[in-house]
Amino acid sequence: MKPFPRAEISSSALQNNLAVLRQQASRSQVMAVVKANGYGHGLLNVANCLHTADGFGLARLEEALELRAGGVKARLLLLEGFFRSTDLPLLVAHDIDTVVHHESQIEMLEQATLSKPVTVWLKVDSGMHRLGVTPEQFAQVYARLTACDNVAKPIHLMTHFACADEPENNYTQVQMQTFNQLTADLPGFRTLANSAGALYWPKSQGDWIRPGIALYGVSPVTGDCGANHGLIPAMNLVSRLIAVRDHKAGQPVGYGCYWTAKQDTRLGVVAIGYGDGYPRNAPEGTPVWVNGRRVPIVGRVSMDMLTVDLGADAADQVGDEALLWGAALPVEEVAEHIGTIAYELVTKLTPRVAVCLA
């Protein structure tokens, strides 16, 4: 018997999405972003499915070491950089690139004794104001890194967009101009584009693109859907009905008696809840896919279960599958009902959810 709840990961969908992004940015190499356990899809699962990617972007050194231990040979980049001086020998030993965004990292590089230089991507704060050296700091920082024997040459250059997922917002153009003016005529690779940049801002594509959410079949833009770009959802979050009950008009259901039936109906109880990472704040009406149709959540999501209104004439039975999001029910749609973003839904699944290649 298949486990439930489970996240079924489609290798063909992942490969399709990589191909779509390559077509969108045909002159760029692809740094597939697989941080946060491959956006909840399983780090090694995703890396193995995307073995033709030119490199992988990660948030933590531990993630990079897991990929190397799993046999991944491609370029790896720590998108937040290293955190401690003791990380540096591991970067050297395992051939891992690092972002540099802060003076403290430069000091650690200058003071380290290493067997060979580290490949560095200098992050420029072109307007997001989160990580990166400011335009005023750039020349001095670049000179220090150039003079540092522990930094491989050439130094690569990157920035990150604040509003690329708002296609009508000109701020992305401002950031591109800032970055391009600062880095004009310098050697090394350049990378600006995240998923939204790759899909909506072709002039940002550069030497490398760094797609994340789009690889998993999800649009980065609110109100949009990955299918509009030829993307296919890579995750089907599936559980099953563990009870089907006749329910009388006027009867409440669930904690707090939050919802009361207005007419006789049949309710289904689905074996998934906030203990599995399904949001407790999912409101009444959030859709679940059961036997070829959308049915609404009613009552509060509890730790292990949620309830759906199957309708008075429903023929659904205990054991029938329920799709919380996936190919038939886009995660973007579910996120919009809940008032969050698809990124949060796919990355917050807990270890109780079995992640398996379909």
Swiss-Prot record:
GO molecular-function terms, A-Z: alanine racemase activity; pyridoxal phosphate binding
Gene3D superfamilies the UniProt entry points to: Alanine racemase, Lyase, Ornithine Decarboxylase, Chain A, domain 1
Species in which this protein is naturally found: Shewanella sp. (strain MR-7)
Listed name of the protein: Alanine racemase
Pathway: Amino-acid biosynthesis; D-alanine biosynthesis; D-alanine from L-alanine: step 1/1
Entry keyword Isomerase: yes
PTM annotation (N6-(pyridoxal phosphate)lysine): residues: 35
First-level EC class: isomerase
Active site: 35 (proton acceptor), 255 (proton acceptor)
InterPro entries: Ala_racemase (IPR000821), Ala_racemase/Decarboxylase_C (IPR009006), Ala_racemase_C (IPR011079), Ala_racemase_N (IPR001608), Ala_racemase_pyridoxalP-BS (IPR020622), PLP-binding_barrel (IPR029066)
Gene behind this protein: alr
